[in-house]
Amino acid sequence: MIKIAFIKFGGMAIGGTEKVLQTIAAELPKDQFQVDFFYCDAAPYIGSDFKHIDTDPSRVEYVKEHGVNLIKFDVEFKDVTKSTHDWVNTNFWDVFKEENYDVIQTGRAGHPEYPFHLINKTPIVDSIHLSGMAENKANSLKTVLISSEQRDRWIASGGSVDRAVSIPNPLKIPDIGDDNYREEFKLENKFIFGLHQRRDNHIFSPIPLEAYDEIETDDTAFILLGGSESYQKQAKDLGLKNFICLPTTGELEIIHKFLNTLDVYAHGRSDGEQCSCAIIEAMSHSLPVISHTAPSMGQLEQIGDAGEVVEGYEDYAEVMKKMMYNKNYYVDCKINSNKRYQDVYKLETVIQKYIEIYKEVVDV
């Protein structure tokens, strides 16, 4: 039995990194792994007005139902004026003892970071979710990068080639049948675009709605699940007629009911992606995907031949029109989306890769 500890600030939130760790922890076979997940609620930052998403009850329920032992600790502040982003007034070290574990699983940015820079004996498997920062810590035996682009950047920043492993984000996809919102919102005969995003102004992109404004007709609609309030303001300013906004949620059934409603996933994010959970979820429904260029370009690798990545809203609008009016192109993108999900992103494939890594580092 391998004893593994997951550690994450705000670890039961519905952000992408948090959901990755929650899914790995939940889906590991419990006849082979004893899984403890250390987490705290969101806390204010010192040195930034950024607000981390807080604990979501549905994510707590999900991991508990799958045999994960949740261990909650307290943090009063996260001090990002310190290079290691220290946790201030925390009882973490009262509840966590590294000698109790065979492996530590992280989900972090890449630079030396609290509390992992103080865990120096137990083997660490890092999951890195930003790019351009690398740390070669002696007991960090494997570093999981979530896209080829990110892996290349991590190695270029000084990361060890031997430690680097590319594994996409693991996602649990519920079976909800054909349940969708079309009848509820009287959208039965419309061609529907949509975007799912956390409520965060820092990642708001104006491009999807700017593009949709160019092509909107009485026979189209755009549905936003979650997302920054800036989207709602933008939709109002543009005078969009068929724009629907659904509240942020961590409940998988609602997310996938939303995705069942769409014809095309209209992705946008100001800083780009490494490996987007939202795009993977969309592909699990065989949805074609449109996106745009950004500083990080993991979305290009993800989408592949399941859609297009363009530079601005005018080109984005042209692809929207092609999706609507070129049936052969649209069907090809749907087929390719499903194939990419089955071949690359299916949960069972991803979890098996993590199992192999954990067994490897324990045997070192």
Where are these regions (language model features)?
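Nucleotide-activated donor-binding/catalytic signature segment of Leloir-type glycosyltransferases, i.e.
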Residues: 232-250
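A charged, aromatic-enriched C-terminal amphipathic alpha-helix characteristic of glycosyltransferases
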Residues: 325-359
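Conserved acidic donor-binding segment of nucleotide-sugar-dependent glycosyltransferases
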Residues: 304-314, 322-327
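Acidic donor-binding loop of glycosyltransferase active sites
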Residues: 260-274, 287
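Conserved donor-binding/catalytic core segment of Leloir-type glycosyltransferases
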Residues: 3-5, 182, 186-203, 209-212
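Short His-centered aromatic/hydrophobic patch
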Residues: 85-88, 106-111, 128
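N-terminal strand-loop element at the rim of the active site
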Residues: 8-14, 30-83, 227-231
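Donor nucleotide-sugar binding/catalytic pocket of nucleotide-sugar-dependent glycosyltransferases
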Residues: 140-176
